[in-house]
Every structure is written in C-alpha cells, then in structure tokens.
C-alpha cells in the first residue's frame, strides 16, 4: 500500500482488537504518521458507533479530517480511543461476555435464565450473553480472547476472568462445541439450535453441565426478570439467583470500565458512548 498510495494520503484499518502500534511496527515513519484505525461496529449499516485510534505521530489535523468525514458524511458517532487492546467497545464488551458466562456457571443458571437477565432487563439486546455468542460466532471467541489476553497484564481483571473460565470448564465447553460444528447460527447451532421434529422446527438450548440439548422455553422461573421492568436497581436488589447474577455481572463490568479511564480513553463520556 505504501508504495502505491498518494503522498500524504490517509490509510486506515478496520481491525477491532489489534493495537495500532503492532500494525505500524517496521513501517517507515512517513507511513505511520498517515495511518489510523477506524473500527466500524458490525453491522455498519445499522450501528452508528465508530472508534478512531491514532498515534502520537499522527497530527490532530488528520485525526480531525477522518473524524469529520465519518461524522458528517457517513453519519457515524465517532469516539476517539487510545491505542490499547480492544480499544473501548471490545475491551469492555468482551469482558462483559466473559464474566457473564463465568457467573452463570457459578450460580448454576441455564442459558435461558442468564440471557433473560442479561438482555432487555439491563437495556441490552434480547440475545443476552449466550445468544450473542451464537450471533457473533463461537469459533471467534477463543481467537478474540487470546488476542486480548496476550496483550494485557496478568493481573488485569480481563485475564482474571479468563482464568476463571478455564477453571470452571467453560473454555473446554466452547472447544468441544466448535469441534462438533456448533459454532453458532452460521453452523449447526450453538448454545441454542433449531431441531426438526416431524417437519417442525423446535428451538433447543444446551445444558451447560451435560452438553445435551432440550426444548427451550421463553419463560424462565425467575421473578427478578419481572422485577427488572421497574429498573436496574429493582433487578439487582431482587432476592433470587437472577438478581444476584445481575449484580455480580454488572458490578464487575462497571468496576472494570471505570478502572480503564484514562488508559483506554481520556474521559468517561467516551466509555458510555462506546457501549
């Protein structure tokens, strides 16, 4: 690219997790000063968020050119991030997924129960934690986790959650599912699947302990799901496994997010914008 590009032209990458400093390593300074990351969130047709990552050698003028173009011409909500693994959205979002699976297994929740809490009651998509994994692709999770984990300190809360996943056997569950072709919606299924029975498609969910599938039900026996309609406080204070699950996941995720300023970005507003 550097050999054929126009002089002073701006080059950007759509990587979602790889630090910019790794991408420009070994490249001439004349290229590095024109190189930024423009991470479009998927699917870009519907999601407005766009993360921009630059380096010290990139001028504010060029950052502003890219930022204004993405804002005014593409209609994106631009968030300026520091050059750290996963930037803002994926750093916090993948931690939420990690700790969501960890706490679900610890509390003995079914995938339906976990997703019923980590969906609409907290203002997230109804897919929740496990359903989201199916949408993204379970085969991508190990790669993203490894990429993030290897670039973060051992004592980072992210890596602590990774170790908990390994200890609880979640990593093994994912590996077995992927090996069997259960990579999510693009494969035979994931934590949820559609099974044909007498010509009818029946939605089934995976038992996290046995690995077996059984008919899935939209209704879960957690009163906290109903309590969540009154707000987050009512949800996290509700005295059942759902309320406890919500508190543990949200409190840890919010604590982690707060601890990352100013590492991942210079102000807390950008953290809220990226979630």
Q: What spans do the regions from the language model cover?
A:
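N-terminal glycine-rich phosphate-binding loop for ADP-containing cofactors
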Residues: 1-275
């Amino acid at each position: 690219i550097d050999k054929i590009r126009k002089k002073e032209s701006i080059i950007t990458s759509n990587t979602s997790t790889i630090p910019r400093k790794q991408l420009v390593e070994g490249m001439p300074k004349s290229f590095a000063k024109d190189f930024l990351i423009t991470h479009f969130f998927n699917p870009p047709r519907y999601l407005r968020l766009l993360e921009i990552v630059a380096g010290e050698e990139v001028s504010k003028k060029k950052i502003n050119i890219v930022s204004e173009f993405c804002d005014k011409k593409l209609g994106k909500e631009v968030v300026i991030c520091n050059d750290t693994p996963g930037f803002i959205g994926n750093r916090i979002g993948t931690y939420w997924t990690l700790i969501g699976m960890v706490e679900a297994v610890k509390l003995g929740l079914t995938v339906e129960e976990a997703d019923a809490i980590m969906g609409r009651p907290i203002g997230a998509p109804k897919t929740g934690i496990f359903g989201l994994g199916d949408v993204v692709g379970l085969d991508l999770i190990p790669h993203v986790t490894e990429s993030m984990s290897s670039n973060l300190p051992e004592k980072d809360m992210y890596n602590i959650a990774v170790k908990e996943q390994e200890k609880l056997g979640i990593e093994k569950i994912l590996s077995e599912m992927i090996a069997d072709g259960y990579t999510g919606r693009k494969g035979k299924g994931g934590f949820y699947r559609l099974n044909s029975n007498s010509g009818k498609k029946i939605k089934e969910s995976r038992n996290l302990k046995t690995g077996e599938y059984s008919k899935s039900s939209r209704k879960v026996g957690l009163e906290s799901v109903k309590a969540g309609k009154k707000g987050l406080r009512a949800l996290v204070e509700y005295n059942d496994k759902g309320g406890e699950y919500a508190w543990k996941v949200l409190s840890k995720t919010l604590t982690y997010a707060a601890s990352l300023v100013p590492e991942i970005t210079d102000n807390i507003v950008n953290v809220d914008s990226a979630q």
